[in-house]
Amino acid sequence: MAGEDPYIMGVSDPQMFAMDQLMGMSTIFNNTGYITSDLPLRTADGPYLQIIEQPKQRGFRFRYVCEGPSHGGLPGASSEKNKKSYPQVKICNYVGPAKVIVQLVTNGKYVHLHAHSLVGKFCEDGVCTVNAGPKDMVVGFANLGILHVTKKKVFETLETRMIDACKKGYNPGLLVHPELGYLQAEGCGDRQLTEREREIIRQAAVQQTKEMDLSVVRLMFTAFLPDSNGGFTRRLDPVISDAIYDSKAPNASNLKIVRMDRTAGCVTGGEEIYLLCDKVQKDDIQIRFYEEDENGGMWEGFGDFSPTDVHRQFAIVFKTPKYRDVNITKPASVFVQLRRKSDLETSEPKPFLYYPEIKDKEEVQRKRQKLMPNFSDGYGGGSGAGGGGMFGGGGGGAGSGFSYPSYGYSAFGGMHFHPGTTKSNAGMKHELSNSTVKKDEESSDKQSDKWDTKHDVKVETVEKNECRTSGHNEEKEDASLCCKDEGNKPKCGCQDGLFLEKAMQLAKRHCNALFDYAVTGDVRMLLAVQRHLTAVQDDNGDNVLHLSIIHLHRELVKNLLEVMPDMNYNNIINMRNDLYQTPLHLAVITKQAEVVEDLLKAGANVNLLDRHGNSVLHLAAAEGDDKILSLLLKHQKASSMIDLSNGEGLSAIHMVVTANSLSCLKLLIAAGVDVNAQEQKSGRTALHLAVEQENVPLAGCLLLEGDADVDSTTYDGTTPLHIAAGRGFTKLAAVLKAAGADPHVENFEPLFDVEEDVKDDDDDEGIVPGTTPLDMAANWEVYDILNGKPYIAAAAVSEDLLSQGPLRELNESSKQQLYKLLETPDPSKNWSTLAEKLGLGILNNAFRLSPSPSKTLLDNYKISGGTVQELIAALTQMDHTEAIEVIQKALSSSQRQSHQEDNTIEAFPSLSPTSFAKEETGELYNHKFQDPESTCDSGVETSFRKLSFTYSDSLNSKSSITLSKMTLGYRKAQCKAVIYLTR
């Protein structure tokens, strides 16, 4: 650090005057680049000034005039709660009277006067003057305050400060302009400045105003020793302190995470988290996730959000990044922190947990993996009969299940039934009442008769006298099963006979059904006698319809729908399991279009919701299944559900856009969906979501086919154009602008901090403009498009070229550029991370041993059959735009032919927005920047365009009026042209 800025070390330089004198010979106007703080150190022999206590860099607030003086002066770097200290300097190698002045200077590479003022004891006109000596040559500054000048008064204040410095000889050659280094030192009285000197000062003030950072200052100490006449004209070399940051400035305050609503997320990322923090600068902040492994490797990812997702500089809504390995089997602990882009300063990291992906959220796979029933478990005899027979007891004995003494079906007397717990009846949650059983039996008999008549099957009855008992011992066992009353006392009559009669009736029905099935081969014969059991649910709440759909038995579902009892038909077909899923929900989830159609014909209710508030329309939209969605939309009751929001506040159109399904979106639009419906969390429309995902086809479909409101706003007044401009989406900005989006719409986010920029400005009191898309433009290309400049499409690269080897079409110079870019020490953009993204991370140790790891990596990738498309996708995940540009430029140049069409909007002269405006008004709408650098101020985002040339223009823009008069047909034609170019 000493080699970079010796002033910070507090040691002066005797060569300064010589350098000032040399640079004073320059006649170049406004060239302040000659004066830098990078001067060599020296060993002082004569008097010199030294800082012995630096000021505290952070935690001190700059105050405005209306706020009054600060509570306590600027503390020293070593100041503590019970031991205060303040900035101090010492004049070394000298004893006697002296005068020390303190001026505020900038923190950049070049030292200039700062517009802020020092206030407090011994301070006048922004400069502090203190007498030192004659014995104690240590000077302390215990009451220094810093007065913050408003941005609108920077030029005026700075010019006055420069004139004063030149008149009094306070380092004018260093702080103002090298041509003014000849002006006398303090003590010779003020002198009048010439017109040329004033012009130099004015030009210097104009230039330095553009570059000044109002959130940070430094102290410059200059000592003057008396001459032979007693005047303080002998100036010692000045020394400059460490930087002092305004505690209220978002780009200077300490970063701190205050609260997060979630501390864990899925490895696939994309989950929304609300984060509260201390004041941040919305275009200069990142949310960094990182993990360090045992071998010193580093993984990092960044939360996804735009400037519109930062609320009042204190809250950020972002989506988590994907973890480096989405196939983990146990949770992975990482850290999350805030990081400032400009200086890479970070907050204290907080723990975050990535858990494995839950691929079976609807528990379909889990239920499919349950042990399938074995045929031997249901067959009589042995442990199998007892363990899994339909009426088997728990003992597992040979006689505990059904007993078949012979294959003659007349021996029904040999059957006996033992009530016991089995797999079949353990999970029955809904027991049928006696009345229900009786009705079902009657219905069953009628249904059996129907099937008998239909298939012309003769059913012979079995006479009671053909039944015979199986023995005296079994009769004793049956007798032991007599029912007991509440007092556990045996009733007078045993119900063995009644139980046996019921069992015989059941056996007859099943026997007849088995005969019918044997004759017809129609499984419905077997299902018909058990249809009253379709209401029974297992441990998961699933009935037979649920399970048939889960296991993909489409024919069985169809058969069950045909034989189910009429009385409970609707209740059974719309029955919900423990996850509140109906059979129709499961059919949509498992993507069985035929089953969905069968259920709808059978009368399934499309209005029922699952545990998350999702209707079947939501589920089909989320899956992006246009075939199933088409079937559902044809249902007569679907229209009432098409705009319904689920538990997350999303309607079907929002989920379709999130799923990136253009075909489903067209179906919803044709069905009359409200394309301007707002999701209930933040008020985003489908167009907002399409822009967030940078999906041009979806946005175009919404605008052209859905007539979406291009200037629809969220709860905070943000339009889709705000999002496109803030994220730097050039294509979408062009599409929205062509569709008539207004770049001057203000959202509710103030362009500047009311408490800071409006102070001492009565004229603007109460008028705080919001932020427009022009203010949020992330790059100059987007800004020019918003101002009406035609969109110029990049040279297209054919799919054939993308499918070739990654380096085949790159020339040698492009390869070298790519190698160099991948050799960067930045772990997020070097060859090692790229290898991980390309699936070659296992070879990193081998690559590291080669002379050029990046070259070796890409050579291996080429040999393995990798494509340019995959390479660009990996680089996109790394956010390595420079490498992507090198590849695309090389591929485009190799493909360029002489007959290549000029892909610009000029190819559509009748559709050009500028030509249209010119025809109507005779003028072109085109802003020109007068200030290429944005002004940094406390509480103001540096990338936001200045109010002077955006907000004021929006009030007087003729072209904005012209655009508002464009017909819908013209806008659609213009939008189509731009969408065509963005392909």
Curated annotation (Swiss-Prot):
Ranges of the ANK repeats in the UniProt entry: 540-569, 579-608, 612-641, 648-677, 682-712, 716-745, 769-799
SUPFAM superfamilies assigned to the protein according to its UniProt record, in alphabetical order: Ankyrin repeat, DEATH domain, E set domains, p53-like transcription factors
Phosphoserine, modified sites: 342, 938
Keywords: Activator, ANK repeat, Cytoplasm, DNA-binding, Nucleus, Phosphoprotein, Repeat, S-nitrosylation, Transcription, Transcription regulation, Ubl conjugation
GO cellular component, one term: NF-kappaB p50/p65 complex
Name of protein: Nuclear factor NF-kappa-B p105 subunit
The protein's assembly and partners: Active NF-kappa-B is a heterodimer of an about 50 kDa DNA-binding subunit and the weak DNA-binding subunit p65. Two heterodimers might form a labile tetramer.
Domain annotation Death: ranges: 804-891
Written domain comment of the UniProt record: The C-terminus of p105 might be involved in cytoplasmic retention, inhibition of DNA-binding, and transcription activation. Glycine-rich region (GRR) is a critical element in the generation of p50 (Nuclear factor NF-kappa-B p50 subunit) by acting as a proteasomal 'stop signal', which leads to limited proteasomal degradation of the C-terminus, while generating p50.
